[in-house]
Amino acid sequence: MLTINSIKNGIVIDHIQAGHGIKIFKYLGLEEADYRVALIMNAESSKLGKKDIIKIENIMEIDYKVLGFIDPTITIDVIENETIKEKIKLELPKTIENVIKCKNPRCITSIENYIPNEFYLVDEENGEYRCKYCDEIYSGGDINKL
């Protein structure tokens, strides 16, 4: 039997698409953490079938826009004294900056490295973003491109 204790203070990143948990874990640099962290993969879920969960025994700064871009179904639970203080449901952010790079070699961001890569959401249903400078379309949510 698998037992993972509750955390006293920290955050739980829940409802991660199965298989994406390890990539989010690495993106957040949690393999270097000096506090307790649990990555649960392929947990049963009534909504998703299977899901990943990350439990972090520490309050840390996380860019919710990036997590929403990776997977808008993620829920963040902020835990204090072993109870959920706040539940944050993520969604696709309207804009993202320096999360992905424009793939257009003629884009100003490819030529001038000091210009931030900025994208804005153009199709929420398909998760498509458009480069602010050259209008190149990027389909969001592909964690492999981070």
Swiss-Prot record:
Keywords: Metal-binding, Pyrimidine biosynthesis, Zinc
Co-factor requirement: Zn(2+)
The keyword Zinc is annotated on this UniProt entry: yes
Short name of any one Pfam family annotated for the protein: PyrI_C
GO biological process: 'de novo' pyrimidine nucleobase biosynthetic process; pyrimidine nucleotide biosynthetic process
GO cellular component, one term: aspartate carbamoyltransferase complex
Gene Ontology molecular function terms on file: metal ion binding
Leader peptide range in chain numbering: none
Residues annotated as binding Zn(2+): 102, 107, 131, 134
KW Metal-binding (keyword) present: yes
Family annotation (InterPro entries): Asp_carbamoyltransf_reg_N, Asp_carbamoylTrfase_reg, Asp_carbamoyltrfase_reg_C, Asp_carbatrfase_reg_C_sf, Asp_carbatrfase_reg_N_sf
Gene3D superfamilies, sorted: Aspartate carbamoyltransferase regulatory subunit, C-terminal domain (2.30.30.20), Aspartate carbamoyltransferase regulatory subunit, N-terminal domain (3.30.70.140)
Cofactor note: Binds 1 zinc ion per subunit.
Family: Belongs to the PyrI family.
PANTHER family noted in UniProt: ASPARTATE CARBAMOYLTRANSFERASE REGULATORY CHAIN
Function: Involved in allosteric regulation of aspartate carbamoyltransferase.
NCBIfam families: PRK00893.1-3 (NF002063)
Subunit structure: Contains catalytic and regulatory chains.
Name this protein carries in UniProt: Aspartate carbamoyltransferase regulatory chain
Gene (name only): pyrI
